[in-house]
Amino acid sequence: MTHILYLAGGSSRRFGENKLLYPLDGRPLYRHGLDMLAALVQTRRDCTLALVSRYGAVLDGARACGVRAVYSPESEKGQSYTIRAGLDALDLQPDDFVAFVVADQPYLTARTMARLLDAARPGVACARVCFGGRCGSPTLFSAALAPGLYALRGDEGGRALLQRPDCVRVPADSARELLDIDTPDSLRQAAE
């Protein structure tokens, strides 16, 4: 089983306000990925989905979509706290995988996400989405790497774990899928 954790707990420091609620194409930013993932999970029997956040409106939005909502009160301290809150909510088994998807990548497609989920197989320790030599989120980790994920601190993500030689690169269809919205300017550019 692959457990998808949709990470929506960031502080939006560079954005100046909660970017997850900021409208993009008629929907709050976080809903783009959430809606795509919720629809994808409905077509597969090999994965679950949970949204992890400290924001009530975002948690309520997940519940309204029928998605499990995990409260992460310490997310303001950094991404590692959101990751741990999500992991704590799982009944992780030795053969399981965990996929981490960040909520500020509105152009990630179901096709690319399905390729990442398909990478969850014996012999694979981790996987990441890449385009043109640039790699980023989303990422996938085998349950065997959970101790390393729990050891993360502050705003550290799993980048160090992804340097392993048994880490698979999953192709995205375009560079736009890896675009994350961190500032109002990046949001305006994305909307163009």
Locations of regions flagged by a protein language model:
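Short, solvent-exposed loop/turn segments at secondary-structure boundaries
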Residues: K19, L149-L152
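Internal, well-ordered alpha-helical segments in soluble enzyme and binding-protein domains
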Residues: T82, T112, L145, G154-G158, ...
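Conserved nucleotide-sugar donor-binding
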Residues: G136-P147, P184
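Short beta-strand-to-turn element immediately C-terminal to the catalytic PLP-Schiff-base lysine
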Residues: P23-L24, L140-S142, I181-D182, A190
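Conserved alpha/beta core of the MobA/IspD/sugar-nucleotide pyrophosphorylase nucleotidyltransferase superfamily
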Residues: A151-E192
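A residue-level structural signature of the nucleotidyltransferase/glycosyltransferase Rossmann-like core
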Residues: Q105, S137-L140, Y150, L178-L179
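Nucleotide and nucleotide-moiety/phosphate-recognizing core
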Residues: T2-A103, Y107-C135, A143, D166-S174
